[in-house]
Amino acid sequence: MKKLLKQSLLGFALVSMTGAAFADAQSVAELQRRLEQVSQYSADFDQTVRSSKGKQIQSGKGKFQVKRPNLFRMDTKSPQENLIVSDGANLWFYDSFVSQVTVNTVQDAVNNTPFVLLTSSDKSHWDQYDVTQNADTFVLKPKSKKSNLKQFDVRIDQSGMLKGFSTIERDGQSNLYVLRNITGGGVSSDLFKFSVPKGAELDDQRGGKKSKK
């Protein structure tokens, strides 16, 4: 009797795991289908940063531009200028306030920078996240316990119109981005080429080197 009960519980666990994996695969496929419907667009964004207790600690504005596959640019204009650019192979982050550029490979950066997924169909990128769907909201959670990210939410309708996205860090701080003035087409590939500004310090995480232009 005990053996039969043990086998039944094991079978139930396996069925539950298989069902969860199937649901996750369905959610990934649906999110990718929606993202792929719009190949390029440009939008303004409003950013709201909240503490782990829900208190607003900062707000910002900027421009978000995407060109599939694998290209995106997030240009924050206020309250402090900074720039994130994916050129398809590398992810560049420029902090103008401290005049520093950090660069990493997209493959290594995707675990902490899920924005990459908005333009990527690379299975190795998506395999780093568990994905669930609730209507037009998709919740992505990194599988790695080493990630600084706890959760990434994407709000996108069935026509592929991205409404916004948000991140929740391990410490509970959240960043909400709401898109507006969305326009499709006419996004130049030159926007996704990055050159280190003169005088800026370069922190090259691809090889762990630091240099100054």
From Swiss-Prot:
It comes from the Bacteria. It is found in: Periplasm. Participates in the translocation of lipoproteins from the inner membrane to the outer membrane. Only forms a complex with a lipoprotein if the residue after the N-terminal Cys is not an aspartate (The Asp acts as a targeting signal to indicate that the lipoprotein should stay in the inner membrane). One of its GO terms (cellular component) is outer membrane-bounded periplasmic space. SUPFAM superfamilies: Prokaryotic lipoproteins and lipoprotein localization factors. Monomer. Transmembrane segments: none annotated. Pfam families: LolA (PF03548). It comes from Actinobacillus pleuropneumoniae serotype 3 (strain JL03). Residues 1-23 form the signal peptide. Its main location: periplasm. Belongs to the LolA family. CDD domains: LolA. InterPro entries: LolA/LolB/LppX (IPR029046), OM_lipoprot_carrier_LolA-like (IPR004564), OM_lipoprot_carrier_LolA_Pbac (IPR018323). Keywords: Chaperone, Periplasm, Protein transport, Signal, Transport. This is Outer-membrane lipoprotein carrier protein. One of its GO terms (biological process) is lipoprotein transport. The gene is lolA.
